[in-house]
A protein has these predicted regions:
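Catalytic-core elements of nucleic-acid end-processing and repair enzymes
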Residues: 1-150
Length: 150
């Protein structure tokens, strides 16, 4: 969205890309957990919520393996109500929520970088270069803070 507000919510077919987005920002470290939602592709036909662009609209959506939904928090809760045995079929819930400790931020980002998931690959443009610099600065500050704690 290039930081424009839209009614669309970004999703990725890649767990690792979702993990990157969950840990990208430094600020939520005050929060105990980062959250990743998993939306099942095999929703009931009346729940046509996943929007896949017919044409690739830019390098970002390609590199992020992205799709969109037009869901409010109310709609997410409604989908969660389908997580009942009579709807589950093969036992796969329609929406799942994963909580991961915010304390793992640097470990997660370092792991993702080791498998080539970083700002350069997520944002293959100038923003990616800027975000890579920000993460480098965050890392340097975190290391300095650790030295002062010892």
């Amino acid at each position: 969205h290039y930081h424009l507000k839209t009614p669309l919510l970004d999703w990725s077919h890649s767990f690792f890309v979702a993990l990157y987005f969950a840990f990208e920002d430094l600020e939520p470290e005050q929060e105990k957990y980062r959250v990743i939602y998993q939306l099942n592709d095999f929703l009931p036909p009346e729940q046509d919520v996943i929007i896949t662009p017919k044409i690739k609209i830019g390098a970002r959506i390609n590199s992020q393996n992205g799709v969109f939904t037009k869901l409010t928090s109310y709609h997410l809760e409604e989908l969660a109500s389908y997580n009942r045995p009579e709807y589950l079929g093969k036992g796969v819930p329609f929406i799942s929520k994963y909580l991961i400790s915010s304390k793992l931020r640097m470990d997660v980002l370092n792991f993702l970088a080791s498998i080539n998931i970083d700002p350069y690959t997520i944002y293959p443009d100038l923003l990616g270069k800027m975000k890579a610099c920000e993460i480098g600065i965050d890392n340097a500050i975190a290391e300095i803070n650790l030295e002062y704690q010892d």
